[in-house]
Amino acid sequence: MEPADLLPLYLQPEWGEQEPGGATPFVEILEQPKQRGMRFRYKCEGRSAGSIPGEHSTDSARTHPTIRVNHYRGPGRVRVSLVTKDPPHGPHPHELVGRHCQHGYYEAELSPERCVHSFQNLGIQCVKKRELEAAVAERIRTNNNPFNVPMEERGAEYDLSAVRLCFQVWVNGPGGLCPLPPVLSQPIYDNRAPSTAELRILPGDRNSGSCQGGDEIFLLCDKVQKEDIEVRFWAEGWEAKGSFAAADVHRQVAIVFRTPPFRERSLRHPVTVRMELQRPSDRQRSPPLDFRYLPHQGDLQCIEEKRKRTRDTFRAFVQRAPLPGLEPNPEPRPPRRIAVPSRPPPAPQQPPSMVGAPPAPLFPLGVPPASSPTPEPLAEALLQLQFDDGVGGSGPPPSTTTTTTTTQCALGGGIPDPGGSPLDLGALLGDPPFDTIDAAELQRLLGPPETPPGGIGAGGGFGELLSLPTNFGDPPSSTAATFGPSPPMLLSYPEAITRLVQCQTPGGSGGGGPPVGPPQDLGGPLHPPGAPPQPTEDSLPSLGDLDFSAFLSQFPSS
């Protein structure tokens, strides 16, 4: 015998009778049906739809929906049907199945001995969506419309995941059976629908975490909707939610979330709180589980707390006596300078000379000029040829100053005095007759000899041949066709000195001096008297013979 069947035995017999005084009978629900935990089954499943449990039903003590008719005792009739959850409460397409069930509703006679009635073996059978209209039409045909909702007020859509039980009672009256006002139960939700299913939480992979929060937990549960579920942590005076996204809900049966931080993040001892699932849409909650918040294990020596105290102490010290670099407007300081040792400029290097270092330059009166041009090397001075513009046709005739400067650079590397003061050639040549000499005379002596009237071949000398205007840059035809006076050309150092000595002898044109010995080549090696002078490597005639051998063959012999 079920516990619900024992209820009439504990009730007084007079409750089934109508109380004197004319009180109106009414129906009261003693045991509400359980809202969640029952599954609506289809007819095609071929099995029983089960039994609707009572609200206080447990695994050890099962209960069922129970009603009581107040202020009445006697025969009567009772009907239980399904209506929609929301008003107006019209007939629902689903139907009740079980003992004494027909056309989708339950109907039975009331026992005259008792006024409390329990409904066992009542199950809910759902219909397919394509059969909704036919099922509703069957309810209207069988007069299964407790609230007489007209067709136009009934909605075209039905909530197939929720129903209500409607209890209708008819009692005997003076004119026969009189209906009592119908009574509705609380909604019953299909356990298959995630939006209405019963929430149930299972122990996860861990039931404790740090008081700082952020620990990852895998939680198992029944079917839930990922957009309509939360993990709630709560204690007395405190509540927080676990953090997770919709993508962290795996197939509606598992949730991966991170724990929220506890209200006291510096715990010294563990604290136990509650953890549960909550559905925001209907505020439905699951049975809670225990969760323990532990002291933070990452800072066993309380280093962060000590560092905070040190930081606060330093900040207070800086506020009392700010450092120089932390002042609001520090005084400007001059830029820092770095001493770099200075080095003397490198001495200019003289180009190598062909005959060695030249003698010291001679300055008249011992005073050097203000600015002096850089002397040309001796090799370039000896090989430089001067040509007349009219003869060579390559440029203007060189000036006397340029020729004199080049000659003096070749002799001593010095620069002549523009005033025409005599040069001390006696000290240079080691001969007293040449102590003083005029610059004009020196120019004439160093210049080429005059061309004889007969032409080039009349003189018969090699020095005369060197006085020809020669320009290696011009074509040979222009050079060979024109002869005449030309600018002086530098000769080699030994031959120029030899000509100077010959002019200063008693038989020479520049005479006046004492007789001297036979002329010698001062620049070349010594040779016996009477022997012809030997050409040297530095003599210009030897170089001229090599350079002009091909050039002289182009001139016609006169």
Curated annotation (Swiss-Prot):
Residues 524-558 are annotated as: Transcriptional activation domain 2. Residues 342-351, 358-376, 526-535 have a biased composition (Pro residues). Spleen; lower level in brain. Residues 317-376, 388-544 are annotated as: Disordered. Its main location: nucleus. Residues 385-444 are annotated as: Transcriptional activation domain 1. A motif (9aaTAD) lies at residues 542-558. Residues 418-433 have a biased composition (Low complexity). The modification Phosphoserine is found at residue 281. The keyword Nucleus applies. Keywords: Activator, Cytoplasm, DNA-binding, Nucleus, Phosphoprotein, Transcription, Transcription regulation. GO terms for molecular function: DNA binding; DNA-binding transcription factor activity, RNA polymerase II-specific; RNA polymerase II cis-regulatory region sequence-specific DNA binding. Residues 25-311 form the RHD domain. Residues 454-463 have a biased composition (Gly residues). The transcriptional activation domain 1/TA1 and the transcriptional activation domain 2/TA2 have direct transcriptional activation properties. The 9aaTAD motif found within the transcriptional activation domain 2 is a conserved motif present in a large number of transcription factors that is required for their transcriptional transactivation activity. This is Transcription factor p65. It comes from Gallus gallus (Chicken).
